[in-house]
Amino acid sequence: MPKREDLKSVLVIGSGPIVIGQAAEFDYSGTQALRVLKEEGLRVILVNSNPATIMTDPEFADATYVEPITPEVVEKIIAKERPDALLPTLGGQTALNTAIALDKNGVLAKYNVELIGANIAAIELGEDREKFKGVVERCGAESARSHIVHAMDEALVAAADLGYPLVVRPSFTMGGLGSGLAYNEKDLHRIAGAGLQYSPTSEVLLEESILGWKEYELEMMRDKNDNVVVVCSIENFDPVGVHTGDSITVAPAMTLTDREYQNLRDISIAVIREVGVDTGGCNIQFAIEPDTGRVVVIEMNPRVSRSSALASKATGFAIAKIATKLSLGYTLDEIPNDITQKTPASFEPTLDYVVVKVPRFAFEKFPAADPTLTTTMKSVGEAMAIGRNFTEALQKALRSLEQKGSQLDFGSVNALDVPELIEAAKRPTTDRLGQVQRALAGGASVEDLYAATGIDPWFLEQLQLLNEVAVELKQAPQLHESLLRKAKRHGFSDEQIAGLTNNAEAVVRGVRQALGIRPVYKTVDTCAAEFAAYTPYHYSSYDQEDEIALHEKPSVIILGSGPNRIGQGIEFDYSCVHASMALRKAGYETVMVNCNPETVSTDYDVSTRLYFEPLTLEDVLEVIAAEERTGGVMGVFVQLGGQTPLKLAQDLADAGVPILGTPPEAIDLAEHRGQFARVLDIAGLIAPKNGAAVSFEDAKRVADEIGYPVLVRPSYVLGGRGMEIVYDEPNLLRYITNATEITPDHPVLIDRFLEDAIEIDVDALYDGKELYLGGVMEHIEEAGIHSGDSACVLPPITLGQGVVDRVRDATQAIAEGVGVRGLINIQFALASDVLYVLEANPRASRTVPFVSKATGVQLAKAAALIGTGVTINQLRTAYKMIPSLPGTPGGFDGGSLPVGAPVAVKEAVLPFSRFRTPEGAVVDSLLGPEMRSTGEVMGIDKHFDTAFAKSQAAANNALPTEGKVFVSVANRDKRAVIMAVKLLADLGFEIVSTGGTADVLRRNGIQSSTVRKVAEGTSAEGEGTITDLIIAGEIDMVFNTPSGGEARGDGYEIRAAAISIGIPCITTVAEFNVAVLAIEAMRSFEWNVTSLQEHAEALLEAAANV
């Protein structure tokens, strides 16, 4: 059936901010979908609150709404745009839940909007656990025995029937939020209690434990003519009990017999038919009991998911793109496969390689969190690698993580340590893979480890094989060709071989190259080379035949940012993709090197060629060598992907590779304290007093000179890793004692901490002569909170033009002094009207996408062209990429936005609800100099107060417009909050506070009821404490600033209670003052929805009328 002609416009719902469990894979699938819809000639309307996505670029939709994804806001967009259809299957759980709400409350019917890509009945059958159980039974398969409960007393009755341990799963949450394993009644109270709150339907499923069974998933697609394809089978390395997003996964499944696989296939096809998914994809998860072979269907997702992004990258089969075409009425046999151009989408992909995905965690950011892996997803990113066998793919994936200790350690193991390693491996943690491999190296048997961990013996034998190769390397008198080739085929890096043979890495590389042992590059082509592939999507292997074609023009290589992590996320991928788009448009051949399966950059048609490879020096040099021998290399971009490629800059330059854009010397100069201080001196700028120390004596001397409080941190970090504000000498001693690896090359840096300063963030472009100021952002929280976690506003709302002009001059001087060609990000602090320079980063920063969306100027594209020699003047005139000069008609830049320009607020999204201490409490939500957010949202409006209110709603932290507010602040903050609290009381809010704060408020004529502190406990009359009130749902917002020492305990309990039930919890005075303004605005004005395209027109109009 050809496509439907009755649909003229479609509204697509995105997935909002990046949170654990719902990450960049939805930007990847959404971007593909928008392209298809545009190609098919539809008017496309998008709503997505995340500015760091490619899909919110104005060119991908006709109307792009960066607005909170809530049913109320989406209804406003529907009323304004009147779309014919709504496509909700590309925005994860957020989009599905919103679509279900709009259907239930009659909005879709009222405006005559049809749901495409999924029907509500199919979603409910797939997502509602009770209904899905019925589906599985009707298909002749079985589910785990279970009970659905809606209250705690029902849960206790169910537990008596099922027996402990049992699995708790709330309905309609994603990434396993609120789920867990209850081993006893106490656990059940804790986990099911939270689960009932997290589930939008207050419904929780309790099921028998299938812990230790083998877990598999199948990724499926079905069209309305009942054609079904299995895109890919995926096997989890860890048995059931670890969320699939936190497990190492392998495609295709390795340990199924053909009969077992056909059985899973038959069940899947029956289930997808019974559920009625007929225009798209879904994934179905299974558990198999290893001893009996009993198969249980765990669950299905009737939408594009994290697994489908992985399956797409693993097979080259564009699931999101094909699902979108199906939703428009096409069938699988009518859709051509882009890669082969000969086969239709109804051909199932065939793999002649192995794919391994390994998760990346961020437990170092939450030292209090319990690192045990459970059914609640905790990983923040993932790396994927492709090899000709499992061992090669596994080792490549582990080195792609770029984490200390992520690679296998082949050092010798004492036999006495083996029992301890086996015991430790029983509990799934991030270290389990290493523990298992080392236990095997120490002589443990495969049987023992299988009994302890439930990891399939086939995987254990593969680890044993790696240990054997390592032993051979250790014992070899010299490196001979057959041994070296064998090691490379099992994925050993030059660095690992050097360690095992007591050589330098450069020596191993020299010997290997002299022996002619180089990798060849194979192609991911969906058909195991049965047909020719037209899209070069490559992976390396130490095999025989090379499959790279010759190219005519020298290539421009862009190094991506590797796996997502806190501090380096999708924002850097955005800059890489923009660079590739701009350079291709300008006629260059672009080559992307990256190993993150979730991102747009690793889509097979974003660049001219894609290499799915780890971002290590060895792997990158081999890609460059391959490009050199097939047509030459013009140069490499290292400043777009964050810290990952920057670290390689100097080594690449030393190897003779041309670096485009800012040279490595300039990158080093900005990172090096002494040299950078000279740049500031010449420019007449000042930094906060600072020093460096390699011992406690040094540190004490520096801190005494500067004066406390001081900010201490290691050199060369991204995301503020290991930073702390230290208020006194005992704490300085503690920091230095705990700081690892202080060396003369890597000293600890100590800065004066500026209290009560306004922090300012600048993104700019510099071409060697001229500066274009991209944006000047003012932070809402005071200095001392990491810029990645602080809310900020553009244009700045309290800085006068005089300050902005000083910022512009300082930026020009620094860019010139450092020698930047392209993007630079500088952080300033304004204290007592003195402008301090905090740091300069000569690279694409985390705020580039936000600034680009807020001002309509795409900075990363411009920076890529500057890297190839284009000037800012040419970008203005010939390329029309940046506006004309400020002061000329229609001219402006990020430091001179006209009055009437829209105001944009960026807010961070924090993952505290995911991380629990071993006792089950939430980790503390206090912000500090170490970055902890996983993603961001943007609120944009004509007025600052409304823009701030939108940003809070988008960050799932909507401000209340009535009710009770709890206020408890440290003594130093009491004066600063009186006016704002009075305004809340005047607006009709009821103020609740503890002793000291209540007295101050009453003396200022503010009515406030007093409540008991946590430490006071429940009174004899049964009056509860503040945390009891919060947990009972009686408080609508918490405002609590920490005061040192003892009250930290009290404050922590209060903040943890607020986070655990999901009410706004504000911890800084600055943010509270702004929140009160926003609440007042929400009560007085109806907010409007405006598309980025309309904001851009308003901005140009305002500039023309200056």
Swiss-Prot record:
Positions with a binding annotation for Mn(2+) 3: Q827, E839
CC per GO annotation: cytoplasm
One Pfam family it belongs to: CPSase_L_D2
Record-linked InterPro entries: ATP-grasp, ATP_grasp_subdomain_1, CarbamoylP_synth_lsu, CarbamoylP_synth_lsu_oligo, CarbamoylP_synth_lsu_oligo_sf, CbamoylP_synth_lsu-like_ATP-bd, CbamoylP_synth_lsu_CPSase_dom, MGS-like_dom
Residue stretches spanning the membrane: none
Enzyme nomenclature, EC number: 6.3.4.16, 6.3.5.5
Binding site for Mn(2+) 2: E299, N301
Keyword Endoplasmic reticulum listed: no
Region (Allosteric domain): 957-1106
Annotated Mg(2+) 2 binding sites: E299, N301
Subunit relationships: Composed of two chains; the small (or glutamine) chain promotes the hydrolysis of glutamine to ammonia, which is used by the large (or ammonia) chain to synthesize carbamoyl phosphate. Tetramer of heterodimers (alpha,beta)4.
Protein name per its UniProtKB record: Carbamoyl phosphate synthase large chain
